[in-house]
Structures are given as structure tokens and as C-alpha cells.
């Protein structure tokens, strides 16, 4: 998995925006794999993507965040909270609000609370 993460990190490099969708989609099966439990590198890779929040990747980001939340709700909510705190852009909050209706119910309510506090 560590070599795979290196490859995905290259796909998700800011200079390779055309590869971002592929990189995000590649992470979902890794996260849901029972053998994988190292989420911090995933959050590190995803940070710049969530800060940019391109509209074209909304569904990919939504799927990835839902998978992360299923694996570790606390870590995922903390990651989102820290991302919102560390950016001056409104794009992440706007994108997250757009995603809300399609997220699992418990994730929706917890994310609403984070959005209320941080925006």
C-alpha cells in the first residue's frame, strides 16, 4: 500500500489536476480494504484537493469522504474541521454543503455541526 500511495500522491499533485479524479477513485477501494488502516497519509493527500474543491470532482470527493467517515468518523470530521480552519477560501464549505444531502444520515448531522462552527 505504501508504494500505491506514492503513485496516488503523484496523480493528486496540484500540477496534475486532470489526474485528480483517477487518484481519488483509486483511494476508495484502498480505504475500504480490511487490510488497510493507515488513514493519516490519505488525509494528507486529500487536504489540497478539498481546499481546492473543484466542482467537477464533487461526487468523487463525496464518495471518498463517505468511505473515510465509515472507517473513522472522528478522524474524518477532524480533518474536515482543520481543512476549513486552514483555508480562507469558501469553496470547501460550499462544496461540503452541496454534498450534504447525498451523505449518510449520521455523517450529514455531524458535518452540519462542523460547518456551523467553522463557517
Spans of model-derived segments:
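Alpha-helical scaffold domains
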Residues: 1-119
Amino acid at each position: 500500500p505504501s508504494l500505491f500511495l506514492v503513485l496516488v500522491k503523484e496523480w493528486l499533485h496540484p500540477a496534475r489536476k486532470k489526474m485528480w479524479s483517477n487518484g481519488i477513485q483509486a483511494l476508495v477501494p484502498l480505504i475500504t480494504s480490511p487490510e488497510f488502516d493507515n488513514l493519516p497519509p490519505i488525509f494528507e493527500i486529500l487536504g489540497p484537493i478539498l481546499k481546492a474543491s473543484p466542482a467537477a470532482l464533487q461526487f468523487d470527493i463525496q464518495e471518498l469522504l463517505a468511505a473515510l467517515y465509515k472507517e473513522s468518523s472522528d478522524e474524518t470530521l477532524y480533518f474536515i474541521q482543520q481543512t476549513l480552519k486552514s483555508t480562507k477560501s469558501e469553496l470547501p464549505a460550499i462544496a461540503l454543503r452541496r454534498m450534504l444531502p447525498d451523505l449518510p444520515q449520521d455523517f450529514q448531522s455531524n458535518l452540519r455541526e462542523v460547518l456551523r462552527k467553522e463557517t
